[in-house]
A protein has these predicted regions:
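Conserved SAM-binding loop
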Residues: 1
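S-adenosyl-L-methionine
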Residues: 4-43
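A conserved structural/catalytic subdomain of Rossmann-like adenosyl-cofactor enzymes
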Residues: 43-273
Length: 273
C-alpha cells in the first residue's frame, strides 16, 4: 500500500508487524502525485484494491494529472477541489485487468455531482460497466467526519452490466462518539451482495427499502445519477395522528396549567404580592 501521512504510515507498518505480516510493503508518499508501487517503472497490478481516501480532497494535483506519465486519468481530470474520482481512477488503473476488484469509501456527492465528475462516472457506467455495487452506510461511522458515506465496488472482467444498490444506513448501533456496524448489519450487506454476485437476483427490488438491482436502462434513465434514493425507496410513511387523542391531551395539559396558575396566585398572595 501507500500512505501520504507519515504518522498513519508508521501506524500501518507497526500494525502489519504486530499481526505477523513482516513482509508487508507500505510506501510513504503521495499516491496521486508520486505512486511508488512500481515494477520496471510501470504501476504494479493487484487482485484487490481497497482505500478510504480523504473525502473531496482539495489541491490533489489536477495540474500534474494532465501530464501523468502513467496515463491514469485518461477518462478525464476531476475538479482540482475534489479528488474523489482521482483516487478511484488510480485504483482502477492498478487493479488487475482480468479480475481486479476495487472497494473504496466515498462521500455521497461522488454518486451524483456533475461536471467532469459526471462525465467520468458516465463513461465508466456506459462504456466499461465496471461498477458492481453501491452500499450506503450509516452516518457518523468514521472518525473525523459525521457525514454519511458509501462504499463503491468495481470489478474488472464482470459479465453482468447491472448494479446493486444497498441502503444500509439505518442498520447500526448508536455509539457515544461514533456509530458502529453490528455483526448482523455486516452479515446482511454481505449476504445480499454475495447473492447478487452469484446472479440470484433479477433486476428490480430485491428487498423492500434495502436493496435494488438496476439495469443500464435504469441508470441511463436517471442521467447516470447514482444517488441511492433514486433506486432504493427510502420513504418512510409518517404515523397517523389520532386527532381526538391529541385534543384530549391538550385539554388535560390546559387543565393542569390552570391548576398550577391558581396555586401560584395563592402563593403570591401569601407572600404579599
Amino acid at each position: 500500500g501507500q500512505e501520504v501521512n507519515g504518522s498513519t504510515w508508521a501506524l500501518a507498518m507497526m500494525n502489519m508487524f504486530l499481526h505477523g505480516f513482516d513482509n508487508a510493503v507500505i510506501r510513504w508518499g503521495d499516491t496521486l502525485r508520486n505512486p511508488k508501487l512500481k515494477v520496471d517503472d510501470k504501476l504494479m497490478k493487484f487482485d484487490t484494491v481497497v482505500a478510504n481516501p480523504p473525502f473531496s480532497l482539495d489541491k490533489w494535483g489536477a495540474e500534474e494529472a494532465i501530464s501523468d506519465s502513467y496515463n491514469r486519468f485518461w477518462r478525464g481530470i476531476p475538479p482540482k477541489s475534489k479528488g474523489d474520482w482521482a483516487f478511484i481512477s488510480h485504483m482502477l488503473e492498478v487493479a488487475d485487468d482480468n479480475e481486479g476488484r476495487v472497494g473504496v469509501i466515498i462521500p455521497h456527492g461522488v454518486l451524483f455531482r456533475g461536471g467532469s465528475e459526471g462525465r467520468i462516472r458516465q463513461y465508466i457506467l456506459e462504456n466499461e460497466h465496471l461498477l458492481e455495487a453501491v452500499i450506503g452506510l450509516p452516518a457518523n461511522l468514521f472518525y473525523g467526519t459525521g457525514i454519511p458515506a458509501a462504499i463503491a465496488i468495481f470489478r474488472k472482467g464482470r459479465t453482468s452490466q447491472n448494479v446493486l444498490f444497498i441502503d444500509a444506513s439505518r442498520e447500526f448501533e448508536n455509539g457515544k462518539n461514533q456509530n458502529k456496524l453490528r455483526p448482523q448489519d455486516i452479515e446482511h450487506v454481505v449476504s445480499v451482495y454475495q447473492k447478487f454476485v452469484d446472479s440470484k437476483f433479477a433486476p428490480g427490488v430485491v428487498e423492500e427499502k434495502y436493496a435494488f438491482v438496476a439495469t443500464p436502462d435504469d441508470i441511463r434513465g436517471n442521467d447516470f445519477n447514482l444517488n441511492i434514493p433514486r433506486y432504493v425507496d427510502t420513504y418512510e410513511e409518517e404515523a397517523e395522528i389520532d386527532i381526538s387523542a391529541v385534543q384530549k391531551e391538550i385539554e388535560q395539559l390546559e387543565a393542569e396549567l390552570a391548576e398550577v396558575q391558581v396555586k401560584m396566585k395563592e402563593y403570591l398572595k401569601q407572600l404579599g404580592y
